[in-house]
């Protein structure tokens, strides 16, 4: 085969890398039942301070504090410290009401200077918590989350092993009236947390302690200087990496379930995920000396961990490169183009089928509620293309002529789907645009939306945009079950 054609074939196949790596993650997650930290855990109920950063959280903070105090955990071993970041709504009133109702168990701390972001508020709370020798562990949560009974106990049991520095739980989308977007997010979390973090546990390296539920031993926080990094938009991930690079384990506890309210519309989700995406780019640069060095340490430096991280981070570029290469192939060797096209999309189809079926094993509750969003995660157009490729494989028929407009549409879809997903977000606030926005998202796929967000995060980082914290508005929609 001509070297140019061979090179183009290799680039086209990059378009199938993400579902292949995702399927490998899910397959490895099955080992978690046999290879996990439970055998080293034990009865452990440390005196725990729950640090809750809050800025204008009047709609949710009261219910969250009440739920924390009602948890199945010894009352004399649990305190709640709400760090009020100079809220301008009724947040202080809601907290102070509970300070009076639960003297000694609820503490209200108003920051010295508001509006600097979550990490700065957390640092003031951590300084207060660690100044008192009473605290043996610190639980950092978001103001809107709701803990299931037994969740904290399931997390603290891992601290019986002194090698463990931090534990995170399984965050579930918990809106009591979930719309189609919330169901997509619920499905995403099933894959990104319930599956991926199990795999990371097996590999010995955790990518991120969930901001809504991360438990630290006092020793771990003190080893980190008693502070959270404020120079990045991914302070949770930096804390996770620093914990493990310092020699302590970070553990995922899938049975520690926490329900959270997620953005109800694409614009709010865009702001949240831009922050996450930029944070991941910052983390990637910060830890360049860590990636793909399995001879130095397992876990974060492992090949599989790095492959998973960079597949997600670079997926938009892989999709664009794959589409462009396929279009070039279509122009110069349409016979080869159709063979590679079929290979890419059949790989997508087999992997997505495996992922959807596996979801019912990993979390039947979420999978049963959101299976339609799971099937349509890659988008309706992609599902149709997978079917078209399957028909080609069965019948042996080639595609339409290389000069036909449909051929160019099929070849370029891996890239153009991101443009359609971006348009769905832009139309959401237009007059009469919400229906079109929803229709376009179903056509392009929620996965395509996540990719275009990552692409936008690249651009903002290249421009050197400010690390401004874009707060996600909470409306008190989270319940313990959904």
Q: Which residues does each PLM region occupy?
A:
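Long helical/loop segments within the catalytic core of UDP-sugar-dependent glycosyltransferases
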Residues: 103, 110, 117-136, 149-233, ...
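The conserved acidic donor/metal-binding loop of glycosyltransferases
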Residues: 142-146
């Amino acid at each position: 085969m001509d070297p140019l054609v061979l090179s183009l074939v290799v680039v086209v196949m990059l378009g199938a890398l993400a579902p292949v790596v995702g399927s490998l993650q899910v397959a490895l997650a099955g080992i978690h039942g046999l290879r996990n930290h439970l055998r080293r855990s034990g009865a452990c109920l440390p005196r725990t301070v729950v640090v809750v950063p809050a800025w204008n959280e009047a709609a949710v903070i009261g219910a969250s504090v009440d739920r924390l105090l009602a948890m199945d955990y010894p009352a004399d071993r649990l305190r709640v410290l709400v760090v009020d970041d100079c809220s301008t709504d009724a947040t202080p009133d809601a907290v102070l009401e509970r300070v009076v109702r639960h003297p000694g168990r609820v503490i209200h701390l108003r920051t010295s200077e508001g509006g600097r972001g979550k990490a700065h508020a957390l640092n003031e709370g951590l300084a207060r918590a660690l100044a008192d020798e009473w605290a043996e562990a610190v639980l950092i949560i978001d103001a809107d989350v709701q803990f299931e009974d037994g969740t904290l106990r399931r997390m603290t049991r891992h601290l019986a092993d002194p090698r463990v520095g931090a534990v995170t739980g399984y965050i579930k989308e918990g809106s009591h009236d979930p719309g189609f977007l919330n169901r997509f997010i619920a499905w995403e979390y099933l894959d990104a947390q319930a599956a991926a973090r199990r795999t990371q546990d097996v590999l010995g390296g955790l990518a991120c302690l969930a901001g809504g539920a991360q438990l630290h031993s006092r020793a771990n926080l003190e080893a980190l200087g008693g502070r959270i990094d404020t120079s990045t938009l991914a302070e949770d991930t930096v804390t996770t990496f620093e914990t493990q690079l310092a020699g302590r384990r970070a553990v995922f506890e899938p049975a520690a379930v926490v329900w959270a309210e997620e953005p109800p519309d694409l614009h709010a989700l865009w702001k949240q995920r831009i922050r996450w995406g930029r944070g991941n780019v910052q983390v990637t640069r910060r830890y360049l000396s860590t990636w793909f060095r399995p001879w130095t340490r397992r876990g974060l430096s492992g090949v599989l961990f790095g492959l998973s991280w960079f597949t997600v981070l670079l997926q938009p570029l892989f999709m664009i490169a794959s589409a462009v290469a396929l279009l070039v192939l279509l122009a110069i060797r349409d016979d080869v183009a159709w063979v590679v096209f079929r290979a890419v999309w059949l790989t997508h189809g087999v992997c997505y089928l495996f992922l959807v079926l596996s979801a019912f094993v990993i979390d039947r509750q979420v999978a049963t509620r959101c299976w339609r969003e799971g099937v349509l995660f890659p988008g309706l157009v992609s599902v149709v293309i997978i079917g078209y490729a399957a028909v080609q494989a069965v019948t042996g028929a080639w595609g339409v002529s290389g000069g036909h407009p449909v051929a160019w549409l099929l070849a370029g879809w891996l890239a153009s789907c991101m443009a359609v997903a971006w348009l769905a977000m832009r139309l959401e606030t237009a007059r009469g645009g919400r229906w079109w926005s929803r229709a376009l998202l179903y056509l392009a796929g929620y996965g395509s939306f996540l990719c275009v967000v990552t692409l936008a995060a690249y651009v903002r980082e290249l421009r050197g945009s400010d690390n401004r914290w874009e707060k996600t508005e909470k409306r008190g929609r989270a319940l313990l079950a959904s």
